[in-house]
């Protein structure tokens, strides 16, 4: 039975917050302030808080009191959901009070709140296309990212005309907590951050609004300082996996081409997810002089990964530091490895930490950001022939075996399927050669098979993308060159 939309929303706010029935008129006026009184008579059949919020926004747009741009609606939507979101002081007090007796419950409660108040965009994330496919490196995870709305041309124009502001300095700064937002900066009224101390400095723990995996978290430094891989990085990642049970923690590299999209603010990512790289076996065990207590090996993975395991955090940090320092200064002309040119460093590491079976684990992924005439985008970057699927930087998440592919592929891959079935003769020019190859390989393909064939091919191409990003190739020659670097580490003081 249809009920009044505003009244139903207010009822849900009261049920999901510390507001009381006596606050109903006050809350109703808060809603009218945000979406306009023109929605007063709109009815609804829904009782889900986020659905009700969306309906209020749609009603406001129809009434002319809410802007048509997604960014304008997000600003108002976040304010509506802020009504059920406790103050930062309350969020932090609740988290740490619960943490004393049950860390897992504290984390679970904060995650539940972040979903309930629509900070983690559960409905939007559900639109993503996601699947696993077997490759020679095990099952890889493929996602076509449809959760983030693409920029409307009107929004792009509005952003260009917006008054310039450097507050907050970036999207990771602590000052985003409760920030209203603007056309060119996301709405954060319902954003909350759990503070914690690391090395006697303030850090923040939050969830990613457009999560790429389960409980996708961000751990960021309280000050706006650039990312830097150092011995401190290894210690911090291990501290995080100790403090947040069941979570991994990793860092993007700190150099262009091989780094992530935000290099201006020190931060790490984590979450409760088992990535393909984690379950990849050891291709060859290695040993490091003076570290017989640390298990070490080269991982059977398309990228160049050393895995270290020990019960002793400090021993892992010491060895990882030695490997990092050696890699930063290591060159091997035959292997195409160059530490620096014209004073510009080329080498860094993408580190990932876990705690498993009572031991700490560090994966150190060797990165090299050289470019050349043949590979202007990066020698160890997706090469031209696979850029029709993935041309962006290979960051932390992809390194671990989860492809984040652009929204354009949803329709482009459907066109490729139709082309293979003979139901269309038009594919995007960048896919033409690939589509022709698939057609030649599958001349009698059926409608029941076509999606699986295309999806499998995308996964195989992603495996190639990771091979391109790998410094040492996965053949015997590459393994020998990798072991030569291990020998170099052992010869270092």
Curated annotation (Swiss-Prot):
It catalyses: alpha-D-galactose 1-phosphate + UDP-alpha-D-glucose = alpha-D-glucose 1-phosphate + UDP-alpha-D-galactose. PROSITE patterns: GAL_P_UDP_TRANSF_II (PS01163). Pathway: Carbohydrate metabolism; galactose metabolism. NCBIfam families: galT_2 (TIGR01239), PRK05270.1-2 (NF003629), PRK05270.1-5 (NF003631), PRK05270.2-2 (NF003633). InterPro entries: GalP_uridyl_Trfase_II, GalP_uridyl_Trfase_II_CS, GalP_Utransf_C, GalP_Utransf_N. Coiled coil: none annotated. The keyword Cytoplasm applies. Belongs to the galactose-1-phosphate uridylyltransferase type 2 family. One of its GO terms (molecular function) is UDP-glucose:hexose-1-phosphate uridylyltransferase activity. It is found in: Cytoplasm. GO terms for biological process: galactose metabolic process. It comes from Streptococcus thermophilus (strain ATCC BAA-250 / LMG 18311). One of its GO terms (cellular component) is cytoplasm. The gene is galT. This is Galactose-1-phosphate uridylyltransferase. Pfam families: GalP_UDP_tr_C, GalP_UDP_transf. Its EC number is 2.7.7.12. The keyword Repeat does not apply. Keywords: Carbohydrate metabolism, Cytoplasm, Galactose metabolism, Nucleotidyltransferase, Transferase. It is an enzyme of class 2 (transferase).
């Amino acid at each position: 039975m249809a009920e009044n939309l505003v009244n139903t929303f207010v009822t849900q706010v009261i049920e999901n917050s510390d507001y009381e029935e006596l606050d109903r008129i006050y809350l109703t006026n808060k809603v009218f302030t945000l979406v306009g009184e023109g929605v007063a008579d709109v009815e609804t059949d829904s009782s889900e808080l986020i659905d009700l919020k969306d309906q209020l926004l749609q009603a406001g747009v129809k009434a002319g009191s809410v802007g048509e741009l997604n960014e304008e609606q997000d600003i108002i939507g976040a304010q509506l959901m802020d009504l059920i979101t406790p103050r930062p002081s309350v969020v932090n007090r609740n988290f740490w009070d619960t943490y004393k007796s049950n860390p897992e419950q504290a984390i679970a409660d904060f995650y539940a709140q972040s979903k309930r108040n629509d900070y983690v965009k559960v409905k939007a994330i559900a639109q993503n296309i996601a699947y696993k496919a077997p490759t020679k490196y095990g099952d890889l995870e493929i996602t076509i990212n449809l959760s983030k709305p693409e920029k409307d041309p009107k929004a792009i124009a509005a952003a260009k005309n917006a008054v310039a502001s450097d507050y907050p300095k970036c999207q990771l700064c602590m000052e985003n907590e409760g920030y209203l937002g603007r056309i060119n900066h996301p709405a954060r009224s319902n954003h909350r951050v759990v503070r914690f101390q690391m090395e006697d400095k303030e850090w923040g723990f939050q969830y990613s609004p457009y999560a790429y995996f389960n409980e996708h978290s961000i751990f960021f430094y309280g000050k706006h300082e650039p990312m830097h891989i150092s011995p401190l990085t290894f210690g911090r990642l291990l501290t995080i996996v100790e403090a947040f049970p069941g979570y991994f923690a990793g860092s993007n590299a700190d150099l262009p081409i091989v780094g992530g999209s935000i290099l201006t603010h020190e931060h790490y990512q984590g979450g409760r997810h088992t990535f393909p790289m984690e379950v990849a076996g050891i291709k060859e065990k290695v040993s490091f002089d003076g570290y017989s207590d640390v298990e070490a090996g080269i991982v059977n993975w398309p990228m160049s990964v050393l895995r270290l395991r020990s019960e002793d955090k400090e021993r892992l940090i010491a060895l990882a530091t030695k490997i990092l320092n050696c890699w930063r200064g290591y060159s091997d002309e035959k292997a195409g490895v160059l530490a620096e040119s014209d004073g510009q460093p080329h080498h860094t590491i993408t580190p990932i930490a876990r705690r498993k079976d009572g031991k700490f684990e560090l994966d150190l992924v060797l990165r090299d950001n050289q470019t050349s005439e043949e590979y202007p985008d990066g020698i160890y970057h997706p090469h031209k022939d696979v850029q029709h699927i993935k041309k962006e930087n290979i960051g932390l998440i992809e390194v671990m075996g989860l492809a984040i592919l652009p929204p354009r592929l949803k329709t482009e891959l459907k066109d490729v399927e139709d082309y293979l079935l003979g139901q269309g003769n038009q594919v995007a020019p960048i896919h033409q050669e690939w589509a022709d190859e698939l057609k030649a390989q599958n001349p009698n393909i059926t409608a029941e098979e076509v999606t699986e064939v295309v999806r499998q091919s995308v996964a195989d191409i992603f495996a190639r993308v990771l091979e391109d990003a790998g410094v040492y190739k996965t053949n015997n020659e590459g393994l020998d060159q990798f072991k030569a670097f291990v020998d170099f580490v052992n010869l270092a003081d």
